[in-house]
């Protein structure tokens, strides 16, 4: 399958909310639009209209990756994914694999360390080695769904990208044609690593506050 940026964001949000707020899943168009446009835990940050999200939903429905749910005393149509782990899905993934794929769909290429730090609400990895083992399994599938990117300057780990979206395909193509980067001094690497760790910590705090705000909004609608 090949997903557009908007389609990948929709699938990623549905995977995320199914795990983190199951009581609010499936999602209405309004709730899904809010999830797509979150300012935290999203790279890139988007500003999609409901019409754009609906277009993505319509396209995903044609690809048999989305289903609608209505009724139960409500006129509001809600949406759930058929991306993986349903009776209609060809793709069957472990909870750990779902967490990794979800994060890559929502935030683009990431290192195993970043995936472990950012996955605490999706799946509890005991260490980075467990993340790396799961990544290896996803790469070694008959039809791989992840790819390792060349290591970048200032990073001790390589980043990994999912292979479902056209955006990720562009990242892979660009990386394959990138010249070998200049390696910065050790001091710069240490400073960069500390900065990344601090930013990740702040992202977690903001993500928690955003989630509580989203839950409050959902309870009022």
Swiss-Prot record:
<dbReference type="InterPro" id="IPR036390">
    <property type="entry name" value="WH_DNA-bd_sf"/>
</dbReference>
<protein>
    <recommendedName>
        <fullName>UPF0502 protein Sputcn32_1644</fullName>
    </recommendedName>
</protein>
<comment type="similarity">
    <text>Belongs to the UPF0502 family.</text>
</comment>
<dbReference type="InterPro" id="IPR007432">
    <property type="entry name" value="DUF480"/>
</dbReference>
<dbReference type="InterPro" id="IPR036388">
    <property type="entry name" value="WH-like_DNA-bd_sf"/>
</dbReference>
<dbReference type="Pfam" id="PF04337">
    <property type="entry name" value="DUF480"/>
</dbReference>
């Amino acid at each position: 399958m090949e997903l557009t940026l908007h389609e990948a964001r929709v699938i990623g949000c549905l995977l995320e909310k199914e795990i983190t707020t199951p009581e609010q899943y499936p999602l209405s168009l309004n709730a899904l639009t809010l999830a797509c446009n979150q300012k935290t835990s999203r790279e890139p940050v988007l500003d999609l209209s409901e019409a754009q999200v609906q277009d993505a939903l319509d396209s995903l429905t044609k690809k048999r990756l989305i289903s609608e749910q209505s009724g139960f005393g409500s006129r509001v149509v809600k949406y759930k994914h058929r991306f993986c782990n349903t009776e209609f899905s060809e793709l069957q993934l472990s909870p750990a694999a779902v967490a990794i794929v979800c994060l890559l769909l929502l935030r683009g290429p990431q290192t195993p360390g970043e995936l472990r730090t950012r996955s605490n609400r999706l799946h509890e990895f005991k260490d980075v080695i467990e993340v790396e083992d799961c990544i290896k399994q996803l790469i070694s599938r008959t039809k791989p769904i992840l790819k390792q990117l060349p290591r970048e300057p200032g990073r001790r780990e390589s980043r990994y990208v999912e292979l479902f979206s056209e955006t990720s395909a562009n990242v892979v193509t660009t990386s394959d044609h990138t010249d070998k980067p200049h390696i910065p001094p050790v001091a710069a690497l240490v400073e960069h690593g500390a900065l990344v760790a601090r930013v990740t910590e702040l992202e977690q705090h903001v993500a928690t506050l955003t989630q509580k705000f989203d839950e409050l909004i959902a309870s009022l609608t």
